[in-house]
Amino acid sequence: MEEIRRYLQLERSQQHDFLYPLIFQEYIYAFAHDRGFSRSILLENENPGYDNKSSLLVMKRLITRMYQQNHFLISPNDFNQKNPFFAHNKNLYSQIIAEGFAFIVEIPFSLRLISEGKKKKIVKSQNLRSIHSIFPFLEDNFSYLNFVLDILIPHPVHVEILVQTLRYWVKDASSLHLLRFFLNKYWNSLITPKKASSSFSTRNQRLFVFLYNSHVSEYESSFVFLRNQSSHLGSTPFGVLLERIYFYGKIERLVNVFVKVKDFRANLWLVKEPCIHYIRYQRKFILASKGTSLFMNKWKCYLITFWQWHFSLWFYPRRIYINQLSNHSFAFLGYLSSLRMNPSVVRSQSLENAFLINNAIKKVDTLVPIIPMIASLAKAKFCNVFGHPISKPVRADLSDSNIIDRFGCICRNFSHYYSGSSKKKSLYRIKYILRLSCARTLARKHKSTVRTFLKKLGSELLEEFLLSEEDVLFLTFPKASPSLQGVYRSRIWYLDIISINDLVDHKSKF
């Protein structure tokens, strides 16, 4: 972001938060295109012609056309009508503008993160290294809890709600009108992943997540404030982590002593409420507690009433269930988490007698949801619905090394993201599907069988490339420091949480 700030020269325009002039700058689209390509999880470009056709010359021609009079006048009321600006090369120009504008709108959020980081004096490397620390938190705390309540937050009823959220940071009316145009045009595909076919919805989900996350953070800040005003519980300070696309707040247990004077006698009242753990990722949040089922039911009614009356978001109470952690698993961040009883037997012997003591230790299992993963791989044509690997159709001009590179990158991304799973059997099955699909794809290209092709190429080379645990620069961060290696030695969590939306949402498009 510092490099982008240097190129954008925001010192003059930042006083008024004018972002619209940046649409006419060439380097904006260069930054947006490079980031979109390097951030691609599976390097599977949905429109290969876009990357081939996009160049600096095309961007200059696009900016020239935008400067022409009456060619770039867009109204939110006529977004479905034909615009003379998009009459020529509609798909290419709309994709470039969508990426560039999504990059521009993120600037106020990024500047806000930088300023907050400087105020709190947060070290950047440590701030990024704890991206996946939510799972060690689950392992340390959820094993002592009893009930879990997972709720799916509804989408805003109208696109204007998200636009109003951005008005706190952007006072530029032209930028807000352009944002309103894009959101109105692609609103259905943004809130419904199955309909995501447009360039703005598939390549710029990051912008929608930023807007939605800032919108939900207003609910959460109000909720924490009201909770503190009406309860004896205290809450730890929290920050809205817009860049990491998840919010974490924890209300800690507190014991207050009240003195009631009656007949000159002091009675001590101890008020002790169970601890509440609150985690949210995008639209889904989880509320867990050590209290009783009645206590969780009160929280459920309180949350539903709070969201409906203060923010006009309608929940379906019958679809919200309170489950016991001992016999229920919940899906979060692409994992399937549950509590498992780990039995252990301790033999105690005295002078004459010996005793066997059975202890059951609760342990959090984080598993790879293999059924949704196979469904996603089948949708991407890596295997069939039964999990049998198949050859993936590729372009004839791709070289063997390029095909292996793509499959290897996909395999390493899965390996890095699910490196902390407690059972690796499902992960090994996914690797096997990708490895054999790569071999069948190469054999299909050379019009040969898999066995013949592997004998010719050498299976060691393919295994070494696909199963290597190299760090992917655009996905992972440096591993834990030597002082932390002894804490979580069995499981390693490291990845850029911005880059794993496709892995978290198994129904997304590979």
From Swiss-Prot:
Gene Ontology biological process terms from the UniProt entry: mRNA processing; RNA splicing; tRNA processing
Keywords, alphabetical: mRNA processing, Plastid, RNA-binding, tRNA processing
Protein's cellular compartments: Plastid
GO cellular component: chloroplast
InterPro entries (alphabetical): Domain_X, Maturase_MatK, Maturase_MatK_N
Signal peptide positions on this chain: none
Keyword RNA-binding: yes
One example GO MF annotation: RNA binding
Function description: Usually encoded in the trnK tRNA gene intron. Probably assists in splicing its own and other chloroplast group II introns.
Protein family according to the UniProt entry: Belongs to the intron maturase 2 family. MatK subfamily.
This protein's name: Maturase K
Organism: Bartsia alpina
